[in-house]
From Swiss-Prot:
Record keywords: Cell inner membrane, Cell membrane, Membrane, Transmembrane, Transmembrane helix
Source organism (scientific name): Klebsiella pneumoniae subsp. pneumoniae (strain ATCC 700721 / MGH 78578)
Protein name according to UniProt: UPF0283 membrane protein KPN78578_12740
Subcellular location: Cell inner membrane
Assigned protein family: Belongs to the UPF0283 family.
Length: 353
């Protein structure tokens, strides 16, 4: 059976010829240009965030000006003068047998000694926090090194700082997996796979618990002032526990420095991740229409607490993130939403009973 003939199609105008794009002329490289040629390097999002964070840190870091040096020198001279005057008063009180003045000099010396000891302790703790950043840079260099012999002692020092005993199962597995012929990169990678996840899991549990408490507190409490005080207290406590977990003892100034670094990182480097992780998921699931305003505020506060905990982990952790071991905000988000839904369902079923 033959198919029917199709009707003829008439075009209004003539067919246009296909346009051939003009070709660029060939470029010949000489020997010098060919040797120095390098492809353009692609800049990733993490590198852009790191560059922006470095710029902000350099802007906020106080510069050592001449006036600051003059003030420091004046304070040093004043301190030496006070000590010299105290020694002279003590000698005069001893010679004249003025026991009341001598007792005052001894009490002042004890107070000054306690203050100097406190400042020395704070400086040591602040130095320990800065040293952790150097250890992280050293570990990053070892992860790209093929040398042999330095990584084992370095990892043993990290385990000792974290309070892990030599008989710990994770350390025993690490000792069984390494041998003398392995490079520093392989030894540090094994430590990051076998030992470091033990501490990271504990830090994750601390972050999950603090984020859940912040979420439920905001969702239930009707007082905004109480909410703010509770969240601030829980966030400071979370930073302290994470720092202690990774073997860092925080003092007053070191705690302020760590809190400043965490907030700086969240404000300038974490905005894009927060929008990407939270905004798209909320738009897709339409949670704003399902939950009340207080519940939505609770989830937001819990996510900010989780974000703060993740950045505290990153600053206190002795090793850089490798592959996909960095905790994601989406994991904590799903936990918070599930816990909040369970709490709301329980609160609705109680009046019915």
């Amino acid at each position: 059976m033959s198919e029917p003939l199709k009707p003829r199609i008439d075009f209004d105008g003539p067919l246009q010829a296909e346009k051939i794009p003009p070709l660029k002329g060939a470029r010949a490289f000489d020997t010098l240009e060919a040797d120095n040629f390098a492809p353009a390097r692609l800049v990733t999002g993490e590198e852009e965030e790191g560059a922006a964070e470095a710029v902000v840190e350099s802007v906020l870091r106080p510069k050592r000006s001449l006036w600051r040096r003059m003030v420091s020198a004046g304070l040093a001279i004043f301190g030496v003068s006070v000590v010299a005057q105290g020694v002279q008063w003590t000698a005069n009180a001893w010679q004249t047998q003025d026991w009341i003045a001598l007792g005052g000099c001894v009490a002042g010396a004890l107070i000054v000694g306690a203050g100097v000891g406190s400042l020395a302790t704070e400086w040591r703790r602040l130095w320990r926090l800065r040293q952790r950043a150097h250890e992280r840079d050293e570990a990053r260099d070892m992860l790209h090194s093929h040398a042999v012999g330095k990584a084992k002692a370095f990892c043993e020092k990290l385990a000792q700082q974290a309070g892990l005993d030599q008989s710990h199962p994770a350390l025993q597995r690490w000792y069984a997996a390494i041998h003398e012929t392995q490079s520093d990169r392989e030894v540090v990678s094994l430590y990051a796979q076998l030992v470091q996840p033990v501490l990271d899991a504990q830090a994750r549990r601390e972050i999950s618990r603090s984020a859940a408490e912040s979420t439920l507190m905001i969702a239930v409490s009707p007082l905004a002032l109480v909410d703010m005080a509770f969240i601030a207290w829980r966030n400071l406590r979370l930073i302290n526990r994470i720092a202690t977990l990774y073997g860092i003892e925080l003092g007053y100034y070191s705690r302020l420095r760590l809190f400043r670094l965490v907030l700086l990182n969240i404000a300038f480097a974490g905005a894009s991740e927060l929008v990407r992780e939270v905004g798209m998921d909320w738009m897709s699931q339409d949670l704003a229409a399902r939950l009340s305003a207080r519940a939505a505020q609770g989830i937001g506060a819990g996510l900010l607490t989780a974000r703060l905990g993740i950045k505290a982990m990153e600053l206190c952790r002795p090793l850089p993130w490798i592959a996909d071991d960095k905790p994601r905000l989406g994991d904590f988000r799903r936990e918070l939403i599930g816990q909040l839904k369970e709490t709301l369902q329980k609160s609705k079923t109680r009046p019915e009973k």
